[in-house]
A protein has these predicted regions:
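Glycine/threonine-rich flexible loop motifs
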Residues: 298-308, 379-384
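C-terminal amphipathic alpha-helical interaction region
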Residues: 229-280
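A conserved helix-loop-beta module that forms one wall/lid of the active-site cleft
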Residues: 389-391, 395-456
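ATP-dependent carboxylate activation and anion-phosphoryl transfer catalytic cores
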Residues: 1-224, 247-252, 262, 266, ...
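N-terminal Rossmann-like NAD(P) cofactor-binding module of classical short-chain dehydrogenase/reductase
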Residues: 372
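A generic structural signal for short coil/turn motifs at secondary-structure boundaries
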Residues: 34-37, 299-302, 400
Length: 538
């Protein structure tokens, strides 16, 4: 009736859980956001096949790019679970309610793959890079612990990004699945799966790294618990948890997304981690280079970094290297199965990245890969200090830290007699007040290791400074970004009013030759972030 004779379509429908009645909501006679997600989840390239169908091919004439042995008419079959979670940026938009509704408010999304729903869910939650390590079991859960059960039961009915964590807290307190379902109307199947995570947490909370058996390690990892979550639960260091797990012989294996549940061989390696026995990473003796992607799109870190990662993969492949991409964003080109020689759809966390490095080292017969951290924005930069220095290709972690750490950068400029606004670094309000007494208002307050002006403020008076420092005390999500401490000071310096801002992009090779790629003058006055300012070249 609609008239779509060839090509792709997207149909959305609703199911009544009480009686199974189905109601069609809408149809899109084209590929859509969900088509892209389905393609990444299954390895079946819907858009590519839809366009071939539109010019006259039939499904049985189009080969499956992953297996090369089956036609496109062979429907994808999966033996894993995929979880997609949107990435919201309400922290960038103060004053918004944070309540989800019929209008899209997310700025990005993550996708995770696991053998079970609990494993996939916890991997997706830690992929968001919003300070959560999984379904609670992390320092951020302490905020929920202060709220009464009655109040949580009221809040769980409101669709917000935090609702899943509220559900986890209620289940942890012993509230039944039926009671939570009645309050929030989330399908009981999902609540049952989340309760499996809570039950496993209860089962191991009184243990410790040295007391865990191999079977216990495998059980807790198969429901998605990260080493960082277990370290929090046991009051241990993450490195201690990792060492104990590896000593017990429990390391992740990598399975392949192959569209056919392993019925045919996959020629395009597209992997996800789990804790089983057989590893499917292909062995070879070529030099491998791992490119760490940018994670979910957000305000200040988007597709421009994915562009860099993708072209780096193409260039390295042309130079004879075996390219390995690590990312968790289904909206990107970097997570296409044919962009790199091998793709790991994994969270960009210390544990997951070190696991990929270990797997690649083993598959290369002990030859360690190189790792590029400078192309994916702040996400891989924050991980640079947790990766062995000898593995990092390009800019060293020490140089990255020198440029990103406000205190070190200020000291460098001062030693080189480079002019800069007067100011200083502070780790508390008292120190910040001392600085403004010396330099005067207005001042610019900036944390280290941020992108897109995250948590930066132009401050005009003492009351505003008090509020800004209070907000920074609770700010943070990953690595060195967050909080106020000796390791995470903020820069408080004089704001230059009526100034013109200029960006210079340069690239340097190992011989010392420098090429200036562009000089951009901002149209907006200083104080407007470069991402929000028009600019002109030259």
């Amino acid at each position: 009736r609609v008239g779509v004779e060839t090509g792709g379509s997207n149909v959305q429908f609703a199911v009544n859980p009480a009686n199974g009645d189905v109601v069609v909501i809408e149809m899109n006679p084209r590929v859509s956001r969900s088509s892209a997600l389905a393609s990444k989840a299954t390895g079946f390239p819907i858009a590519k096949i839809a366009e071939k169908l539109a010019v006259g091919y039939t499904l049985d004439e189009i080969p499956n790019d992953i297996t090369k042995a089956t036609p496109a008419s062979f429907e994808p079959t999966i033996d894993y679970v995929v979880t997609k979670i949107p990435r919201w940026a309400f922290e960038k938009l103060p004053g918004t309610s944070g309540v989800l509704g019929t209008q899209m408010q997310s700025v990005g999304e993550v996708m995770a793959i696991g053998r079970t729903f609990p494993e996939s869910l916890q991997k997706a939650l830690r992929s968001l890079e919003q300070g959560r390590l999984g379904l609670n079991c992390d320092p951020a859960e302490k905020q929920l612990a202060q709220i009464s059960t009655d109040e949580l039961m009221r809040l769980v009915d409101i669709p917000t990004p935090d609702r899943i964590f509220i559900i986890g807290e209620l289940l942890l307190r012993g509230v039944s699945v039926d009671a939570v379902h009645e309050a929030c109307k989330v399908d009981p199947w999902f609540l049952d799966q989340m309760s499996i995570i809570i039950e496993e947490r209860d089962a191991v909370k009184s243990s410790n790294p040295s007391a865990m058996t191999k079977a216990a390690w495998k059980r807790v990892k198969r429901v998605g618990f990260s080493d960082a979550q277990l370290a929090y639960l046991w009051g241990s260091a993450e490195s201690e948890v990792r060492a104990a797990r590896e000593t017990a012989g429990v390391i992740p294996t990598y399975k392949t997304v192959d569209t056919c549940s392993a019925e045919f061989a996959a020629l395009t390696p597209y992997h996800y981690s789990t804790y089983e026995d057989e590893n499917e990473v292909r062995e070879s003796d070529r030099q491998r280079v791992i490119i760490l992607g940018s994670g979910p799109n957000r305000i200040g870190q988007g597709i421009e970094f994915d562009y860099c990662c993708v072209h780096a993969s193409f260039a390295l492949r042309d130079a004879g290297f075996e390219t390995v991409m690590v990312n968790c964003n289904p909206e990107t080109v970097s997570t296409d199965y044919d962009t790199s020689d091998r793709l790991y759809f994994e969270p960009l966390t210390k544990e997951d990245v070190l696991n990929v490095i270990a797997a690649e080292t083993a598959a290369a017969g002990g030859k360690k890969p190189k790792v590029i951290v400078s192309l994916g924005g702040q996400t891989p930069l924050k991980l640079s200090g947790q990766i062995p220095v000898d593995l990092i290709a390009g800019t060293s972690p020490a140089s990255i830290d020198l440029a990103e750490d406000r205190e070190k950068w200020n000291a460098l400029c001062e030693s080189l007699n480079i002019p800069q606004p007067p100011g200083g670094t502070a780790i508390n309000l008292e120190q910040a007040m001392t600085i403004v007494d010396r330099v005067g208002f207005p001042v610019l307050v900036r944390p280290s290791y941020v992108l897109g002006g995250r948590a930066m403020q132009i401050v005009h008076d003492r009351d505003h400074l008090t509020r800004a420092m209070a907000e920074l005390s609770s700010f943070g999500s990953l690595g060195k970004e967050g909080g106020l401490s000796a390791e995470r000071p903020v820069l408080v310096d004089r704001f230059l009013e009526d100034a013109t801002e200029v960006d210079v992009d340069a690239i340097r090779d190992h011989t010392g030759e420098v090429l200036i790629g562009g000089v951009m003058e901002h149209v907006e006055e200083a104080g407007v972030h470069s991402g929000d300012s028009a600019c002109a070249i030259p």
